[in-house]
């Protein structure tokens, strides 16, 4: 799934005026999970993430709790900054396995949230969210272990993890 398909999936949130908090959290987190699940690692010859399935319910519950807490706020909310620790937690310990080896995420990277001015255009928020997601993936760091040449290891970084446009 590309980030444009993530955006298409999330456009369901632009329909009815009163989307439930649960549907909002479920749509964003499952869309993110699907988007990163379909990334492939160029260093391991097309490796896929193999251990992120248990991370989706955790991500959903964290995001849902934050959204519910935000409903009680009367101050300005920066949801993209609030997502940072959740996304970093999602990436901690991720393993990517491919035909030529395994890449392990040892450093879940850094998160940079973009402040979005309050508006009524969900596309602005979605575009900012995708920018944060894509920028974060570039900061991932880890180690690659070759299965073709035993004992060969190399440092690994997020730019090796690629997606469709």
Where are these regions (language model features)?
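Amphipathic alpha-helical hairpins/coiled-coils and adjacent low-complexity
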Residues: 1-165
